[in-house]
Amino acid sequence: MNNEVWVLGATGRTGRMIARRLHEAGVPLVLVGRDRQRLEGVAAGLGGAPRLLMGSLESTLAGLAQDRPGVVVNTVGPFTTTAAQVARACPVGTHYVDVTNELPAVQQILALDRQAAAGGQVFVTGAGFGVLATESVLLRLCQRQPPPARVRVDAMASVGMEAGAVGAALAGTIVGILSSSGREVWHGRLVGSRAAAHPAQLTTPDGDVLATRSGASGELIAAWRASNAGSVIAATALVPSGAFTRFVLPALPAVLRIPGVRPLAVSAIARIPQHAQQRPRTWSWAHARAEWPSGEAREGWLRIGDGHDFTAAAATEVTRRLLEGQGRPGADTPGALFGPELAEAAGGTFILDRP
């Protein structure tokens, strides 16, 4: 194993942002992608130092066993397709990091815990705004407390958009939310629920009023593991509302389960052009509320700037720590592995109730 970091999907927005932060930290990089011209452009923006690797995902993974990098950072979506494929291809001693918030992808990586531990590897899934932000608030609320009876987490990202296509990673997350009939934890079991259920309006510490609804996301799994609560709801401001929720959303899961429809939907959304624009609000927010059988309740917030910036910072911090030998072998979410302080290291600020 060497100390190189392979960044898969290095020409996408998230991949570029992570690569820049790692390069500025002096980490030896291999930029991985399918388009030589775009990879060369990314490398030129970093000073031309990184090594480039062109090819399909399959050919890239075939080369892992020979090169044995220190860490592989996966930003290639949809993660439900790529996450386990990439993690399984990592040779003994090579660590894995992704930025997914897709529930199946998070489950797939966590299911590789024994494989990772046996190989002396650390697999970290959800090392971005999705998963880490809400997970870290809940971990803070539950520190030195017995398991709560009920928890709810809400993610409210505010991100600036650059000109270009949506991209496969974000498209995969969107389709993952739309294709699910909903999930929640009820009586300690992961169960199906109505699409876009549990609506709420939250007033953030700076006075914004934001609407959220529950969905199937990696945040749900992370919140369940962080709290061990019997009832867990994970909600997001990304879930549509209004007439779309009432009439269209309930039918989408069945449509997207038709063979071949889901990849077509991901591909179509990934190609949608978007215009450059500033983020709509100054802050992104993650919120958590926990209630105990005694009647005690606590809630807290994590304040973040741009959600994309936080994702890049979080993935970079996790990668840096793995290169330094931190983290126990196995598969985990970032907050569970490194504690809620990881969110602060990535630029977040906690605002918590005081018991």
What do the predicted segments below correspond to?
Residues 5-25:
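N-terminal Rossmann NAD(P)H-binding glycine-rich loop of SDR-like oxidoreductase domains
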Residues 8, 143-299:
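Active-site-lining helix/loop region of Rossmann-like oxidoreductase modules
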Residues 65-66, 80-98:
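Rossmann-fold NAD(P) dinucleotide-binding segment
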Residues 251-355:
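C-terminal active-site/capping subdomain that shapes the small-molecule cofactor and substrate pocket
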